[in-house]
Design a protein with these regions (language model features):
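Phosphate-binding site recognition
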Residues: 1-190
């Protein structure tokens, strides 16, 4: 499956001025899946830690530590090597640790070569996270075009885009197919 936000993640990875990433968005929009898929395709190693379920990580990170010690701890927790530029560290549910902003900022200042992405359930509070210290992306629910991609309706996607761009009408059969897919899309939204 492809999400439009993936292009922004690739840009983030390649950006030499990259800051720790916060992927924010509503529940059940695919934030964890997106970062795991991105990590598995773009990096040698993807380290994932869920701060909502990993009590030892949450307890450890809730107390101030030296950034290098934190990186070693997270590497041990994830059970995979954390290497500059070839590993992606994903911290899920960072809203569970109120002072995580300070910790991530310290790591980024001391070790900018590490790629750190985090997942925030909801919308980041600007009082807790400085927009100058983080790259923040928002993942929205699947849109209709992404739904068509997920269902391998590439030709239909292209036709809709072409007719929209040209301000031209679709043929009846094509329009019926587009409406049928749109109804399925609306039903999928109900089940989120």
């Amino acid at each position: 499956m492809r999400r439009k936000c993936t292009d922004s993640l690739i840009y983030w990875k390649k950006n030499p001025g990259r800051k720790p990433l916060i992927l924010q968005g509503l529940r059940q929009t695919g934030k964890t899946w997106l970062l795991m898929d991105f990590g598995n395709k773009q990096y040698e190693h993807t380290l994932y830690i869920n701060l909502e379920t990993d009590r030892s990580a949450t307890d450890y990170l809730s107390v101030p530590h030296d950034p290098q010690e934190v990186l070693l701890f997270l590497e041990t927790c994830a059970g995979k090597p954390l290497r500059p530029a070839s590993s992606l560290l994903i911290l899920d549910n960072i809203q569970c640790i109120p002072q995580i902003s300070t910790l991530l900022t310290s790591i980024a200042l001391d070790f900018p070569q590490y790629h750190i992405a985090s997942i925030y359930k909801g919308v980041v509070n600007s009082d807790s996270f400085s927009v100058h210290d983080f790259d923040i992306l928002t993942l929205y629910p699947l849109d209709f075009e992404e739904f068509l991609w997920a269902n391998a309706e590439f030709a239909l996607t292209r036709e809709i885009r072409n007719h929209f761009s040209d301000f031209s009408s679709m043929g009846k059969k094509l329009h019926e197919k587009a409406l049928s897919q749109f109804r399925l899309y609306l039903l999928s939204l109900i089940h989120i």
